[in-house]
Amino acid sequence: MLVKNLIIYAVSDSVGETAQQVAKACMSQFYVNETYEIKRFPYMINKGVLLETLENAKAENALIVYTLVDEELCSIVERYCEREGLSCIDLMTDILREISKRTGRKPKREAGIIRKLDESYFKRVEAIEFAVKYDDGKDPRGVLQADIILVGISRTSKTPLSMYLANKNIKVANVPLVPEIPIPKEVFEIDTKKIIGLTNSPEKLNEIRTQRLKALGLSSKANYANLERILQELDYSEEIMKRIGCPVINVSNKAIEETAGIILDIMKENGLKIYKEIEI
């Protein structure tokens, strides 16, 4: 199917520069009058985040170009794209296989091994590891150590935003708001300037959750995607955010980059330390 506005997802378990540059080099071979966009998704080391990225790619009918050295992650991309009819191009596996065949050696399969491990890079890795460790309220102690805390109900982009901000060396913890589960006391022990509330429209949540259930092979009639349940969760989250006194961002129809930009602006306005984005 021909598309007027081509979108390419450059997906990597490292920085993603290779996938992005290859995509740019290929695009330069065409006289493109129409607009196109290359979106880079680095550090795809979390299966859940990777799956969510693939779901977004499907929604945008994007071409996926990826440099993943982890065989399991490669398999996830291949299976998803085959099932959903998406086009994807693996830039590394065939080359690794041929080199292995000719040399008799096995690849290390370490993401980002070519990179220079300088201080800034280690800070970024630390922030990413922090985001993974304290994702989805796994350990409330992370709330006390984080530069910023995201709160919101399921499917309000907490995890992808945490990873995106981590790539700017910002340590982010996110806390899910569920009516049946008490919010960690640590949330009320920190400066509210560090907390950002996330919400979404009921219709969008219903759509996203239904797609999520389908991707997991579950019934779309589950309570998770029920509109009445969603409204209940939204009311609960609104009440909690008012108690906290934090700013709230509606992520409906917003790209991750756009929402992250709003968060960074709020951090600046609140006088919180902002880490300069590292150009790599």
From Swiss-Prot:
Listed EC numbers: 2.7.11.32, 2.7.4.27
GO molecular-function terms, A-Z: ADP binding; ATP binding; phosphotransferase activity, phosphate group as acceptor; protein serine/threonine kinase activity
Record keyword tRNA-binding present: no
Residue numbers binding ADP: 152-159
UniProt keyword terms in alphabetical order: Kinase, Nucleotide-binding, Serine/threonine-protein kinase, Transferase
Catalytic activity: N(tele)-phospho-L-histidyl/L-threonyl-[pyruvate, phosphate dikinase] + ADP = N(tele)-phospho-L-histidyl/O-phospho-L-threonyl-[pyruvate, phosphate dikinase] + AMP + H(+); N(tele)-phospho-L-histidyl/O-phospho-L-threonyl-[pyruvate, phosphate dikinase] + phosphate + H(+) = N(tele)-phospho-L-histidyl/L-threonyl-[pyruvate, phosphate dikinase] + diphosphate
Role according to the record: Bifunctional serine/threonine kinase and phosphorylase involved in the regulation of the pyruvate, phosphate dikinase (PPDK) by catalyzing its phosphorylation/dephosphorylation.
Family, as annotated: Belongs to the pyruvate, phosphate/water dikinase regulatory protein family. PDRP subfamily.
Designated name of the protein: Putative pyruvate, phosphate dikinase regulatory protein
Organism annotation: Clostridioides difficile (strain 630) (Peptoclostridium difficile)
